[in-house]
């Protein structure tokens, strides 16, 4: 299991294998993370559990049906369940351990920051990656 935590460690979690790993350039992720993009790892919901701090996770509905999670103590982004409840999406900076996976895609490059240039060879998608 991969362990992770927020900045203050009030929220601690463990996760199973990463099935999605990518950089999201949508304007909401850029605003929420205060960066050019958010690097997110997806794990199946049944392979995720909070060790401590589930009660410290607060949600903000950034768009209908989509919630962003954050720690009510330190304000760090926190793992959030997908709108269909099948996955947990974890901001990759929260991992304490090497997740054993690496990003494979850039998504929402159609709305990326104009001041950021993508210089790697990862696949790029204007919106969500094709499945």
Features from the language model and the residues they span:
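A short Gly-Trp-Pro
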Residues: 1-131
């Amino acid at each position: 299991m991969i362990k992770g935590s927020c900045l203050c460690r009030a929220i601690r979690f463990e996760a199973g294998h990463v099935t999605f790993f990518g950089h999201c350039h949508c304007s909401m992720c850029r605003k929420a993370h205060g960066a050019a993009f958010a690097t997110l790892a997806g794990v199946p919901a049944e392979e995720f559990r909070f060790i401590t701090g589930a009660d410290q996770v607060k949600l903000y509905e950034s768009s209908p049906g989509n919630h962003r999670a954050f720690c009510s103590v330190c304000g760090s982004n926190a793992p959030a369940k997908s709108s269909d409840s099948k996955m947990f999406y974890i901001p990759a900076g929260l991992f304490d351990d090497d997740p054993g996976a690496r990003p494979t895609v850039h998504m929402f490059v159609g709305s990326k920051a104009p001041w950021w240039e993508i210089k790697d060879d990862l696949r790029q998608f204007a919106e969500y990656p094709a499945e």
